[in-house]
Design a protein with these regions (language model features):
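Single-stranded nucleic acid-binding surfaces, predominantly the OB-fold ssDNA-binding core
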Residues: 1-95
Length: 95
């Protein structure tokens, strides 16, 4: 999905260590953005190499940006075993 959005807030790049599915240490890199189209507001993250590539980039909150995103529905269970869903928005590109 690509949408014209205003960037309300930008977080610095964060790197978090974790253990991957094969038991190997790995690093998860992300940069968070609070985006609005004037009606809806969402939180989305740029991850991996793309997050690193825009680490020093500044964004003008008064300018609209073409933001290309993908959305992922995540299923999870709470401590009582009830199933819940949440959405993750990942930024692919910001123009």
């Amino acid at each position: 999905m690509e949408k014209l959005m205003f960037i309300s807030k930008v977080s610095p790049v964060e790197e978090r260590n974790y253990t991957d599915r094969n038991g190997q240490p790995a690093v998860f890199t992300s940069r968070g953005f609070l985006l609005t189209d004037g009606i809806d507001t969402i939180y989305a993250e740029a991850t991996g190499d793309y997050a690193k590539s825009i680490a020093s980039r500044t964004f003008d909150p008064a300018s609209a940006h073409a933001v290309q995103m993908s959305f992922i529905a995540r299923e999870w269970k709470d401590k009582d075993g009830a199933t819940h869903y949440s959405n993750d928005a990942r930024i692919i590109r910001i123009a």
